[in-house]
Curated annotation (Swiss-Prot):
This is tRNA uridine 5-carboxymethylaminomethyl modification enzyme MnmG. It comes from Xylella fastidiosa (strain 9a5c). The keyword tRNA processing applies. The gene is mnmG. The lineage of its organism: Bacteria, Pseudomonadati, Pseudomonadota, Gammaproteobacteria, Lysobacterales. Its cofactor is FAD. Coiled coil: none annotated. It is found in: Cytoplasm. Belongs to the MnmG family.
């Protein structure tokens, strides 16, 4: 029998954003969990930009929170500047973003991990995994310790065969100051995984005391400040500070162009593809040669540190070039660099080798989450981590896995995109990736997912009570307003005209007035007989959106129902696609390569035809009838 110190239900390797959420989710649902990290002090570290949220990403954070995750709580504890992006646009694309104090964020994540029942931490580098045939059964540390578990979640970030590049200089590292997981990467390459390389980068850090802020544009945060968590309180946020905006200059671009031959990106030194939507400054100068300047967001890394993160000048140019280009930027003429920028290359595995649960198809019980699957970003990693940790715990207990559908969550879009299409560049989330984004808003992530999370064991009693109280308050307010009818001649109709300047031509239910573009909930509450309304801004927002967008939401729900007809029809793991008569060679090869788990996933494979899906459905139905017979 394995000593209890070495035996667990779930082992999570790596304690970044994916690993932290994976370990917490597994333990929260009852699994005895071990979190292995090479350094306990870097649990929850923000390796690159000190920010959480943004377009698409903020939606993921809200979904993580709706499922009981940690990221939103940590952001609320660490956010030092808050903004609602796209505030003037529709609710589907509004997104919350906060600048975060690195130390406060890391401390908040560590506190939650250390306070979680059934979750142990151990500091050790992992060199290999333990296997019994094609099933994982544990992990081996650098010092030879064997930890056993029937499920392992690997969240290695940029550490698998990581290599840092600064000009012609290159060396092995997981990130600056941390060793790479070289041995583990080599062992995984021996397995039946499709391995490739990706690249990401980070800008030089600047001593904020050496900057001239009068040459920049101040960017204050929003007031009132939003929160990330549905149960958060802006009163608990740290003090809010400003960010600043500046630009590169023509001189900056001249310096970069003159040094391109020394850039690892252009010398052939770097093999991996970089993130399309977060290019290096040298990439921007080359790709957008017609632009005279590029915007830089000057972001503080914390309340009690001097470091500034110049968002927009990620680079792997030699240090002497970095210093020259930094000092050519407006307001940076006397800048002192505290840490150089660099690029890092690392191994990732083709996510088409994953099930929707994030369990690998090749190795039973082994789950991947985060950058190992080809994604970029803290939020994408954390969302995958939560899902992988949940499903690892369910795997151990013999329960079916759970993954949200594309119409249920951005997490569902993320996973489906990865396992169906794969990626050859770092994948990041945007609202444009979702077909049903009016359904997948930040504001209703709890309504979409919290009840499911409760059934899965992810939601504690306090959050469940808070969620139910909110839903009941929304229903009560909708019911209250629906009871009011105004006519051109009654007292309420006259109040509406006097207060809002709206003349009614017929009897109207008050709640229908919110469907008018010029009226909202706050306006209606100015009508004496209707106000003052509810105090909770979240409740008021849900009342307004449910009314104002009812027609659009109903039409989208009908479309989802039509699309769901065959979405969940399962395809057996060992299904013989060659036995389906009439499939083209192209379609057959794609099906055999991707091995979709459901007909819905098969429909989304590029090049798949309606005729091929019909043939597949006929064959599956024939198989079902044969089994019954």
């Amino acid at each position: 029998m394995t000593d209890s110190f070495y035996g667990y239900d779930v082992i999570v390797i790596g304690a970044g954003h994916a690993g932290s959420e994976a370990a917490l989710a597994a333990a929260r649902t009852g699994a005895h969990t071990l979190l292995l990290t090479h350094n306990i002090e870097t649990i929850g570290a923000m390796s690159c930009n000190p920010a959480i949220g943004g377009i698409g990403k903020g939606h993921l954070v809200k979904e993580i929170d709706a499922l009981g995750g940690a990221m939103a709580h940590a952001a609320d504890a660490a956010g030092i500047q808050w903004r609602t992006l796209n505030a003037s646009k529709g609710p589907a694309v509004r997104a919350t973003r906060c600048q975060a104090d690195r130390a406060l964020y890391r401390a908040a994540i560590r506190q939650m991990i250390e306070g979680q029942a059934r979750l142990n931490i151990f500091q050790a580098e992992v060199d290999d995994l333990l296997f019994e045939g094609d099933t994982v059964c544990g992990a081996i540390t650098h010092t030879g310790l064997h930890f056993k578990a029937p499920a392992v979640v690997l969240t290695a970030g940029t550490f698998l065969a990581g290599k840092i590049h600064i000009g012609p200089t290159q060396y092995a590292a997981g990130r600056m100051g941390d060793p790479p997981a070289t041995m583990l990467a080599a062992r995984l390459r021996e397995r039946l995984f499709t391995v490739a390389r990706l690249k990401t980068g980070t800008p030089p850090r600047i001593d904020g005391r050496t900057l001239n802020y009068t040459a920049m544009q101040e960017q204050p945060g929003d007031a009132p400040r939003p929160t990330m968590s549905f149960i958060g309180n802006s009163a608990s946020h740290p003090p809010q500070v400003s960010c600043w905006i500046t630009q590169t200059t023509e001189r900056t671009h001249e310096i970069i162009r003159a040094a391109l031959h020394r850039s690892p990106l252009y010398s052939g030194q770097i093999e991996g593809a970089g993130p399309r939507y977060c290019p290096s400054i040298e990439d921007k100068v080359v790709r957008f040669a017609e632009k005279n300047s590029h915007q830089i967001f000057v972001e503080p890394e914390g309340l009690n540190v001097i470091d500034i993160y110049p968002n927009g000048i990620s680079t792997s140019l030699p240090f002497d070039v970095q210093l020259e280009l930094v000092r050519s930027i407006r307001g940076f003429e006397q800048a002192h660099i505290t840490r150089p920028g660099y690029a890092i290359e690392y191994d990732f595995f083709d996510p088409r080798g994953l099930k929707a649960s994030l369990e690998t198809k090749a190795i039973a019980g082994l789950f991947f989450a985060g950058q190992i699957n080809g994604t970029t970003g803290y939020e994408e990693a954390a969302a995958q981590g939560l899902l992988a940790g949940l499903n690892a715990a369910r795997h151990v207990r013999g329960l079916s896995s759970w993954t949200p559908r594309r119409d249920q969550a951005y997490l569902g879009v993320l996973v489906d995109d990865l396992i169906t299409h794969g990626t050859n560049e770092p994948y990041r989330m945007f609202t444009s990736r979702a077909e049903y984004r009016l359904q997948l808003r930040e504001d209703n992530a709890d309504a979409r997912l919290t009840a499911i999370g409760r059934d899965l064991g992810l939601i504690d009693d306090a959050r469940w009570a808070h969620f139910n109280a909110k839903q009941e308050a929304v229903a009560r307010e909708c019911e209250r307003l629906s009871a009011f009818w105004a006519t051109p001649g009654n007292a309420l109709g006259r109040e509406v005209k006097e207060t809002l300047g709206v003349t009614l031509s017929r009897e109207t239910n008050i709640i229908d007035l919110m469907k008018r573009p010029e009226l909202d909930y706050a306006a209606l509450m100015r009508v004496p007989s209707l106000g003052p309304g509810v105090d909770d801004a979240q409740v008021a927002e849900q009342v307004e959106i449910s009314v104002k967008y009812a027609g659009y939401l109903n039409r989208q729900s009908e479309e989802i129902t039509r699309q769901q007809r065959h979405e969940a029809t399962a395809i057996p793991l060992e299904f013989d696609y060659a036995a389906v008569r009439g499939l083209s060679t192209e379609v057959l090869q794609k099906l055999q390569h991707i091995q979709p788990q459901t007909v819905g996933q098969a429909q989304r494979i590029p090049g798949m035809t309606p005729a091929a899906i019909s043939l597949l459905l006929v064959h599956l139905e024939r198989m079902r009838r044969n089994r019954v017979a």
